[in-house]
Amino acid sequence: MLEIGWRLRDKDVWAAVSGLTVGEAWLRRDEPKAPEIVAKYERAMEQLARGVPFAYAVGRAGFRTLDLTIDARALIPRPETEGLVDLVLQRAHGGLAADIGTGSGCIALSLAVEGSFDRVIAVERSPEAAALAWENVALVRPRTPVEIREGDLLAPLAGARYRAIVANPPYLTEDEYAALSLSVRDFEPREALVSGPDGLDATRAVLAGAAALLEPQGLLALEIDERRGAAVRALALASGWTRMEIHDDIFGRPRYALAQKTALEDE
């Protein structure tokens, strides 16, 4: 019979692999344990001992109201990104929304579950990450339709106009990536983190092409590196955007760039 020490990490792991809250796991600690859950627990503990991030080890990650499947096919959702969703939900309603570089699908699914959009299109260039996003669509089963399209950045969005385009693109340089902790570099997908010599290749491309895809007064919302607010604002102005706001994340760092399409951008 499996003996769990019920230290904080033990409880967290058991709760995650068994689909319970930590409180529920504690209350049911003396109940017989299903062999398949025991196997998941032991596998997760072995992975944690090797330095695998907690979310990957247990195969689950929370994001806003969602409990999602997660593995090394996509980045682990970050709490900072939840704030990006907040800003979009406050400013955009109805119509089509798009999520660029969806990864696990956390942004797209949050927009579908919490927002009032008619439909959400999620774009992902990695076939493996796109498959994970589809798994999470099946898991969450949002009432608002979510469609995953494979392709790079804005290309799969052609042929429609969007009320909101949201993106958490890669935004690090190679040097910044090299300075990350081993728990990130050894396990999370590099291509979801690094974006050219200045870290802005993906952001630059989205700023250059998004206006043509937005409805009048449509919203572009980007997560950005905290060190690049001024650079992103300059890129936006160079791309013809006339309204750009930079907002702080929950840690007080400039993290979100919001641009609204005006008549000038529609010319």
Regions inferred by a protein language model and the residue ranges of each:
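Conserved Class I SAM-dependent methyltransferase catalytic core
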Residues: P197-Q260
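Mobile active-site "lid"/loop adjacent to the S-adenosyl-L-methionine
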Residues: Y171-A202
